[in-house]
Amino acid sequence: MKNYRAKIYKYYSNVSGKDLAPQTVEGFKPREPFYNKLIKEYFPQNKEIKILEIGCGYGAFGYFIQQAGYKNYIGIDGSESQVHEAKRLKINIQLANLVEYLKSIDDESIDLLIAIDVIEHFTKEELSDLVDDMYRVLKKDGKIITHQPNATSPFGNSIRYGDFTHELAFTHSSMSQLFLLSGFNSVKSYEDKPIPHGLKSTIRLFLWEYLVKPIYKFALMIESGGVEKDIILTKNFLTIIKK
């Protein structure tokens, strides 16, 4: 039986119908607030740290990481078309199977590991093994940043089933289970809510915080009799994992 992943990933940017690479790096601008927020809030100050991004696509995050002055960034992706687009944009991305690449890395050699919209592409068995390798390659006190579909969100299925290669969606509790079982010390998840960087985004954040989210929390309270204090309802969410 032919591996459907190999069939799709070879031409991922052509068949996914979304996230097509821009013609120039100026096309990264719409994602700048998101990526710069991650860099500002979760990256160490030391610009010499070793950063590995797996499943980096055509390198949008890598572009902003390098623009922020970090000198030792490596991006890995398994899609020939995505890596081709990255090279066209002059972003240093390598073509490799990320599972095999992780296995080839020395123990405790990475300071920061990034997996944005990646882990949902694996089965449970595959992901469990992948997380074990993440733990192995990460230095003591190292950090992982992940971003994934939210199974708790009323909007989450649009992400979970919006890509044929998605295998899983997650909750903040399932993320804690996954990483704590592999030995990590801290797993904290956060909403991927609108980031204010202008009038429109500020209004979106206000409406999310004071209208949309309270309505859904109220509906959940009616259905179940209570709501978790730290419930996350955005269709994607962030998780910060520390070794």
What do these predicted ranges mean?
Residues 145, 190-243:
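A C-terminal cap/extension of S-adenosyl-L-methionine-dependent methyltransferases
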Residues 133-139, 182:
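Conserved helix-to-beta-strand junction in the class I
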Residues 100, 120, 153:
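Active-site micro-motifs of SAM-dependent methyltransferase domains
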Residues 122-123, 138-140:
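Helix-to-beta-strand junctions that scaffold the AdoMet/dcAdoMet cofactor pocket
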Residues 146-168:
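Short, glycine-/aromatic-enriched active-site segment of Class I SAM-dependent methyltransferases
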Residues 72, 144-145:
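A short hydrophobic/small-residue beta-strand
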Residues 167-182:
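Short alpha-helix
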Residues 1-108, 112-116, 126-132, 190-194, ...:
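Conserved N-terminal segment of class I S-adenosyl-L-methionine
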